[in-house]
Amino acid sequence: MSDDRKQIKRALISVYDKTGLEDLARALNDAGVEIVSTGSTAAKIADLGVPVTPVEQLTGFPECLEGRVKTLHPMVHAGILADTRKEDHLKQLDELNVAPFQLVVVNLYPFTQTVASGADFDACVEQIDIGGPSMVRAAAKNHPSVAVVVSPSRYSEIIAAVGNGGFTRAERTALAVDAFRHTASYDVAVATWMGEQIADADKPFAEWIGASYERANILRYGENPHQAAALYTDPAAPAGLAQATQLHGKEMSYNNYTDSDAAWRAAWDHERPCVAIIKHANPCGIAVSDVSIAEAHRTAHACDPVSAFGGVIASNREVSVDMAKQVSEIFTEVIIAPSYEDGAVDILSQKKNIRILVAPQPQRDELEQRQISGGVLVQRRDLVDAEGDTPANWTLAAGEGASEELLAELEFAWRAVRAVKSNAILLAQGGATVGVGMGQVNRVDAAKLAVERANSLAGDEQRAKGSVAASDAFFPFADGFEVLAQAGVRAVVQPGGSIRDAEVIEAANKAGVTMYLTGARHFAH
């Protein structure tokens, strides 16, 4: 037995979450450990027939103020904070008739769960734990003498340690680190929520941002093999792609996650059944279909079958057996969906390496952050929900008003172009992209690329002719539009707002092309 183990003779237990409490209490009692406990925890232990000392018996002071004060007392904290390596501490304990604790087991009031439930302000405030964090921090500070455990998932470690003569110093230090992280996350949640309650409605961004993330996985590498990488999750946030359930395939890579996030967002930009195929965070193809999700996948893939090789597929509907059969014929890195029809996973998993994920619908009110040197940029995520994203609010600037069918085509293109890196021009026909010009430093080249890809990837077919186009930002000159008109594009939707809008609109009228202005922009960098 290592000399730095601290035999557990006395334990303080105060937990809101009673998971595993019975096994823990019985194991401690069987090992001869004295248990001191509080409130409902003490009552639960007593109901088990396990000897327990209520904390008020220890302090000689009753629980008061509706339970707000239970453990905030020197008889408790002196027993936690005494450094038993020091003779003067031991002497003071003896003089004060205080016995030291070697183990503190505490978990906190469910503050974040209460906030998430929609409870009112006072109810949320009532769930801000005071005594719990005080005990946890005290025990963590005094880890040379005390082990602190804040999660029921670690109770098995306590039971093992009791049988082995206590925790080692290294184990107590690791537990202390876990405890400080726990209280730090708790305080961040409280401070963030309180700040939101007093925020000025005209200033939607908080004066202070705190965040806590837990490492979920160390990845093989980052964007490139020489870059180390890891995945972290926010335990207080609603589940998202980072918490997706993987049903099959190799481990997710850094690039798999970035492409999957782009694909998942792109698919859910559409209310209709949609499939998005993404590679290097840009669409190879996006399509909607009211016929079947398999049809949406077929037409999305047809946009650019060359680039779709090794891509990421996202569906905003259940993946059908028919779609699974189509996907199984193509090399695909990742497929993500809210669910899979019976038999679909069996078909997909015939490919050993394909990663099959189940993920919840993305949250619609997220802020997004981007690190820059010395700080972080924060913005509301582009959810394609600006006033100008609704066709009813568009302005007809040139040509004849669109039919219901044509307007639906334009709306699809407009929603799809959000997923394309700027400068972006997207061509669509029949509810599917047919040519995507992405990531160009001028709009003329983006238009040329969209037309070239629409036509060159279709053999003898000139898919640009008769298509509709969406531009993520205005045309600064008429030249970008003229590329589209010469290719036979029949209608264009774009934000407008250029000082040369009149020139662009005049060119559209001359070409007989319908043009709508949205007043909204969808840059993506």
Swiss-Prot record:
SUPFAM superfamilies per the UniProt record, alphabetical: Cytidine deaminase-like, Methylglyoxal synthase-like
Known catalytic reactions: (6R)-10-formyltetrahydrofolate + 5-amino-1-(5-phospho-beta-D-ribosyl)imidazole-4-carboxamide = 5-formamido-1-(5-phospho-D-ribosyl)imidazole-4-carboxamide + (6S)-5,6,7,8-tetrahydrofolate; IMP + H2O = 5-formamido-1-(5-phospho-D-ribosyl)imidazole-4-carboxamide
GO molecular function, one term: IMP cyclohydrolase activity
InterPro entries, sorted: AICAR_Tfase_dup_dom_sf (IPR024051), Cytidine_deaminase-like (IPR016193), MGS-like_dom (IPR011607), MGS-like_dom_sf (IPR036914), PurH-like (IPR002695)
Domain named MGS-like: residues: 1-150
Protein origin, superkingdom: Bacteria
One biological process term in Gene Ontology: 'de novo' IMP biosynthetic process
NCBIfam families, A to Z: PRK00881.1, purH
Official protein name in the record: Bifunctional purine biosynthesis protein PurH
Gene name per UniProt: purH
